[in-house]
């Protein structure tokens, strides 16, 4: 259990942060702010959210994409990170698990996730 003063401070930090609602299985496009010397630029990372863990300020999510030469790339982002410029949900996936770590072993069509039909 957290100290109530710490909890109040964390709540004030989270008030002005807004994130779209997403869950494991959704395809996301993340805009990541990168600072190189004096310049800043936005680099986009697109992949499937395979896990969300933690709560409050400590909440993180893991995004996986297949890069060049069929190499899987996973990045873990803090939910309320200052370096996240934008988060966009491209597809809503239909999965029955909260953690999709089994996708690490799948290749090609076996790694696909069904899309939610409206």
Swiss-Prot record:
One of its GO terms (molecular function) is structural constituent of ribosome. Signal peptide: none annotated. It holds the Pfam family Ribosomal_L19. This protein is located at the 30S-50S ribosomal subunit interface and may play a role in the structure and function of the aminoacyl-tRNA binding site. GO terms for biological process: translation. This is Large ribosomal subunit protein bL19. Keywords: Ribonucleoprotein, Ribosomal protein. Belongs to the bacterial ribosomal protein bL19 family. InterPro entries: Ribosomal_bL19, Ribosomal_bL19_CS, Ribosomal_bL19_sf, Translation_prot_SH3-like_sf. It comes from Helicobacter pylori (strain G27). GO terms for cellular component: cytosolic large ribosomal subunit. The gene is rplS. NCBIfam families: rplS_bact (TIGR01024).
